[in-house]
């Protein structure tokens, strides 16, 4: 464990004023007004881990079909206008895109872990793509 420098601190000395103690006791004994219960919150990371397990078990497509279809058609227009797609072709494209993204994020996570981090950053994606031999 790293050592830390000790610094002198002024001691306040004496006891706390009586007013503070009296107000604390009054707050404890007084009934709570409103009765509004705070919503339950999980610890940070708990929900994320639950979602990771859920999505690793599932096999359904995670990108919505219509937005993906619009994106494919928009990109295809740059190459040739009035292209038509079979629905199975768009489905196959979406399957391959999602498989590619999942494997890219797996490699990206390994790059972040190698750098002793738990948060992925853009430089991890760049390194993963560079190691795969992808450019552009």
From Swiss-Prot:
| Disulfide-bond pairs as recorded | none
Name the GO cellular-component terms: nucleosome; nucleus
For the modification N6-acetyllysine, which residues carry it?
10, 15, 19, 24, 28, 37, 57, 65
PTM-bearing positions, type N6,N6-dimethyllysine = 5, 15, 28, 37, 80
Which key words are in the record? Acetylation, Chromosome, DNA-binding, Methylation, Nucleosome core, Nucleus, Phosphoprotein
Where does the record place the modification N6-methyllysine?
A: 5, 10, 19, 24, 28, 37, 80
Summarize the PTM comment.
Phosphorylated to form H3S10ph. H3S10ph promotes subsequent H3K14ac formation and is required for transcriptional activation through TBP recruitment to the promoters. Mono-, di- and trimethylated by the COMPASS complex to form H3K4me1/2/3. H3K4me activates gene expression by regulating transcription elongation and plays a role in telomere length maintenance. H3K4me enrichment correlates with transcription levels, and occurs in a 5' to 3' gradient with H3K4me3 enrichment at the 5'-end of genes, shifting to H3K4me2 and then H3K4me1. Methylated by SET2 to form H3K36me. H3K36me represses gene expression. Methylated by DOT1 to form H3K79me. H3K79me is required for association of SIR proteins with telomeric regions and for telomeric silencing.
Its domain of life reads Eukaryota
Grouped into one coarse class, the protein's main location is nucleus
- Cite the PROSITE patterns for this sequence: HISTONE_H3_1, HISTONE_H3_2
GO molecular function term, any single one: protein heterodimerization activity
Segments for region (Disordered):
1-43
Q: Name one GO biological process term.
A: rRNA transcription
- Subcellular location(s) of the protein: Nucleus; Chromosome
**UniProt xrefs under SUPFAM superfamilies:** Histone-fold (SSF47113)
Q: Which InterPro entries match?
A: Histone-fold, Histone_H2A/H2B/H3, Histone_H3/CENP-A
The PTM Phosphoserine maps to: 11
Report the residues modified as N6,N6,N6-trimethyllysine: 5, 28, 37, 80
Q: How does it assemble?
A: The nucleosome is a histone octamer containing two molecules each of H2A, H2B, H3 and H4 assembled in one H3-H4 heterotetramer and two H2A-H2B heterodimers. The octamer wraps approximately 147 bp of DNA.
Q: Which family does it belong to?
A: Belongs to the histone H3 family.
Q: What does this protein do?
A: Core component of nucleosome. Nucleosomes wrap and compact DNA into chromatin, limiting DNA accessibility to the cellular machineries which require DNA as a template. Histones thereby play a central role in transcription regulation, DNA repair, DNA replication and chromosomal stability. DNA accessibility is regulated via a complex set of post-translational modifications of histones, also called histone code, and nucleosome remodeling.
Q: What is this protein called?
A: Histone H3
